Amino acid sequence: MFLMNMLCLIIPILLAMAFLTLVERKILGYMQLRKGPNIVGPYGLLQPIADAIKLFIKEPLRPLTSSKLMFTLAPMLAFSLALSMWIPMPMPHPLIHLNLGVLFILALSSLAVYSILWSGWASNSKYALIGALRAVAQTISYEVTLAIILLSTMMMNGSFTLSTLTTTQEHMWLIFPLWPLAMMWFISTLAETNRAPFDLTEGESELVSGFNVEYAAGPFALFFMAEYTNIIMMKALTTTLFLGALHNPLLPELFTANFVTKTLALTMAFLWIRASYPRFRYDQLMHLLWKSFLPLTLALCMLHVSLPTVSAGIPPHM
């Protein structure tokens, strides 16, 4: 039974990830006044399946000088971590009810750094190593702000359990009282998932394609799948944290439809940003975090910690 539950979680995620690649190519196409994929199947709907078949039947090449074990393990670790992050997500019921679901997600997203580092180091290529070091520095840096924003949000929630956020946001979405945090969270998730305009790790003019430059076929597909699964996961987490889900006692069936609609809208905003903005310079990226986001999030976190203490003695009618 537990295996069935796992499959019922993993298969829709993989389907969503496959069609997200098509949605991205369509959005980029229409924003550049062209059609995007429209040959394979009606309106190009079978394009992700064709891409998957092409990637998985190719021969996975491995550089002669690379470290065999790490080179093979890195993409597998990346993809398994990307799928594991979905375990505590309430949609509307999580796979496992974790008391500290938020910390679990944070810990796994920190572990994902190792897969990037291993792939860059094991490839034995200077481009891959520089790309990996950039990605690791960027991911670790933005983890700090993500953790502080999560801490402030959990102050409003009262616990680290994601399922209780639905009850917290019955009357009002948390995006309204926490809008500065929500904006910084959105930008930090862009940096966390290495997406434009923060895709410094794969600056084509400098690093060919970043840490996965030596990968081909199946292992490359695993990295690609991990990236897109992470994007959907981050947007699903954003929906849970800030946009609440529709909590209608008369129509509880609408929960999932509502959740999916909001997640899709946020994911399309991600893709829209990719089509609209140029890439940042690396020092600007770090300055944005350490000189702007970190002081702001720390100040707001202190505010959210002190407000309940300060207002504890005020009578309710005031």
Swiss-Prot record:
What are the GO MF terms of this UniProt record?
A: NADH dehydrogenase (ubiquinone) activity
Q: How does it sit in the membrane?
A: Multi-pass membrane protein
**Record-linked InterPro entries:** NADH_UbQ_OxRdtase_su1/FPO, NADH_UbQ_OxRdtase_su1_CS
Report the EC code(s) recorded for this entry. Answer: 7.1.1.2
Q: Where are the transmembrane segments?
A: 2-22, 37-57, 69-89, 100-120, 136-156, 171-191, 206-226, 253-273, 294-314
Location in the cell reads: Mitochondrion inner membrane
Q: Name one Pfam family in it.
A: NADHdh
Q: Which GO terms describe its cellular component?
A: mitochondrial inner membrane
Name the enzyme's class: translocase
First-listed, main subcellular location of the protein, grouped into a coarse class: mitochondrion
GO annotation (BP), single: aerobic respiration
Catalytic activity reported: a ubiquinone + NADH + 5 H(+)(in) = a ubiquinol + NAD(+) + 4 H(+)(out)
Q: Which keywords does UniProt give here?
A: Electron transport, Membrane, Mitochondrion, Mitochondrion inner membrane, NAD, Respiratory chain, Translocase, Transmembrane, Transmembrane helix, Transport, Ubiquinone
The Swiss-Prot or TrEMBL record describes its family as follows: Belongs to the complex I subunit 1 family.
Q: What does this protein do?
A: Core subunit of the mitochondrial membrane respiratory chain NADH dehydrogenase (Complex I) that is believed to belong to the minimal assembly required for catalysis. Complex I functions in the transfer of electrons from NADH to the respiratory chain. The immediate electron acceptor for the enzyme is believed to be ubiquinone.
This chain's protein is named NADH-ubiquinone oxidoreductase chain 1
Organism in which the protein naturally occurs: Tolypeutes matacus
